[in-house]
Amino acid sequence: MGIANRKQQKLQIGVSKQQDNLYFVWLDELHKVQSICLNTQQKDIFSQLLPHLPQKNSQCCFVGAISPHLTWSKTLILPQTLNAQECEQQCRFILQKELPIPLDELWFDYLTTPLKQGFRLDITAIRQESANAELEKYLPLKLTALDLLNHSILRAFYAILGQEPINTLFLYQDQQGCLAVCERLQQRQ
């Protein structure tokens, strides 16, 4: 009997830039939050970060958070479940119908949530120009993905609490601003 060959998962590292500092946060092997702050004036940020990362994990992806005010979003509650192709078609249809911007100038993503009666489709879009400007702020560090700030903060609260509470108001504040997110059974405000 052989040992199953597991595909090595990439370590996701959240990155936030505030003035001349880059803040990195990730979960270690015990699912405990680890973080470090590095000054962007330092040479080769990655080599400064590497000693703090788990030794087993040589692959990582950097995820930056983008403010919701730079994005467009819409939530649909649908009567039936959609597959990935149908979700993408629905997103393209909604974006073409509701935004005065050509699809080739947008980046979009969606999140699906099965409901007791139906299906929730959360669509988020951003102008490529805005996304690229945001990515440039982090250079020479290359981000793998941009995530919505409110989603990132909610996941952080969930990690701290160890569960996903319902009907809860979360408040977050830092030097760049404040954010209030209310998570209810079938909606997020």
Question: Where do the PLM segments sit?
Answer:
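Hydrophobic/aromatic-enriched cytosolic interaction surfaces used to assemble or bind macromolecules
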Residues: 1-189
